[in-house]
Each structure stands twice: as C-alpha cells, then as structure tokens.
A protein has these predicted regions:
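Glycine-rich nucleotide cofactor-binding loops and adjacent beta-alpha elements
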Residues: 1-181
Length: 181
C-alpha cells in the first residue's frame, strides 16, 4: 500500500469511506528513529523457563526501561498483569525448555492473556533450540512445532505487530543481544 493510501485511509473522511467500501485499513507502522536510546520504546514482558532467558537477562535492561516477568519472583522483576500492567510493546518467550508435547500448553498460558494488553506495533519473539541439534526425536518435534505456532500467532497479532522465531544452537547464546535489538 502506498503512503498516499495510508494517509487517506487514516484520515477522518478516509476511515468512513474505507469502512463503507470494505477496503483494508492499514496501520501506521512504528519505525526506528535516530536518537532512540533503547530498541523497545515501552514495556517488555519476559516469559518461559529455559536457559536462553537466563542469557537474555544480563542485557535485558539495555532493551527497555520497563521490564516485567510473567511469573511472580522470576528474575526479581515485577509481575505483569493484564488488569494493572502497562500496554506491552514487546514479548520474549523462551521455549527452549519444552521437550514434550504436553508442555506446549505453556505457550497458550503465556500468550493468551497478553494479546489484549499489546500496544501498537508490538514485537513478539519466541526463542527455541535448533531441532536438528536435539538428540531426542520428541523434543526435536516439539521445537519444530514452534514454527507453526509462530506463523499462527503472526496472523493473529494485528495492530502492525511482528512475530519472530529464533532457533538458537548450542553456543549461540552470545549472539542473542544482537538478534533482540
């Protein structure tokens, strides 16, 4: 969609006309601006229990000034709740510890309450282990299923959001900061 259509569709007259004709109403996407101190301009929610989240914690405060945890007492961060927490600009879920299909319920338990609390142009990152690096075939299948989950999540996110799945191999934890910036 061109910029002229975006401008028109977001004007007061354009909104009425676009709605009446059933045309798509594009969202103005948030772009990087020079001089921004931190990559995430808003609240960041961390979830999951894997070792990759442990690797994120040393630099998490460089990403944003509003860090929250999905659980009480995790990393000494305040717990985010949909009723009382701020709108979320980014979510990071570490799924590297998921090795059995029964554990995939943790994805729903984390993401379902957060979707109503997302700000415009949110960024969602799911961290997993490279399936080919796992010896257990069930664990490899569980990690591969994260791809389908993130594709589905990407279709549901709305408001100009993006969803990424990062498969991290053993020893790749040192590059996480660059990937999350």
């Amino acid at each position: 969609m061109s910029d002229r259509y975006l401008t028109f569709a977001n004007s007061s007259t354009g909104r009425r006309l676009v709605g009446a004709l059933g045309l798509p109403a594009p969202v103005r996407l948030e772009r990087w601006m020079a001089g921004r101190v931190r990559p995430v301009d808003g609240a960041l929610l961390l979830g999951g229990e894997g070792e990759l989240l442990q690797a994120v914690m040393p630099f998490a405060n460089k990403l944003t000034d509003q860090l929250f945890s999905a659980r009480d007492g995790q990393f000494d961060l305040p717990r985010w709740t949909a009723e009382h927490g701020p709108k979320l600009k980014a979510l990071v879920f570490d799924a590297s510890h998921l090795t059995r299909f029964e554990q995939l319920i943790e994805l729903r338990d984390f993401f379902q309450p957060t979707f109503k609390g997302l700000a415009n142009s949110p960024r969602v990152v799911v961290l997993g282990r490279a399936p080919e690096s796992l010896k257990d075939p069930v664990a490899a299948s569980v990690q591969r299923s994260l791809e389908g989950f993130t594709r589905s999540l990407g279709k549901e996110i709305r408001r100009g959001g993006s969803v990424q799945l990062l498969y991290i191999g053993k020893g790749g934890e040192q590059q996480l900061e660059g990937a999350l910036r």
